[in-house]
């Protein structure tokens, strides 16, 4: 389907943290008919994988949840001097990335690398609820890869990054 239509449909699904079932259902229903993908659901996280025997695997991931809704559902189109904008909860963080990943997952049947598409719950809240962490704990094989891309918004730039802590003692 049309990427803009998919994007708007996803934005119009309320998916506040801990209440992602409707959007996880929509993601699963979008992916399931495509025979080139093995689709697995864990809670309200959905993982789709190709199995083409490629030498490398790329993991492309994004979270399904949003912060609470504040009178911004349903979405609407706002006309500005530089173009039309979809306005609504999650348009930037991160349903735009989810829409792009979903569109690619269903259309990219023969990629040069195997691909894992991970759509996970509960990123916007405390780490103990994080769906990506749960997938890594329950089924690490599902997100094993050689390289990963997180579809978080970056103002249109590719950014390298990592998450971690450093502990030291000053004497």
Which positions does each model-derived feature cover?
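General beta-strand structural signal in soluble alpha/beta enzymes
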Residues: 40-42, 87-88, 117, 149-151
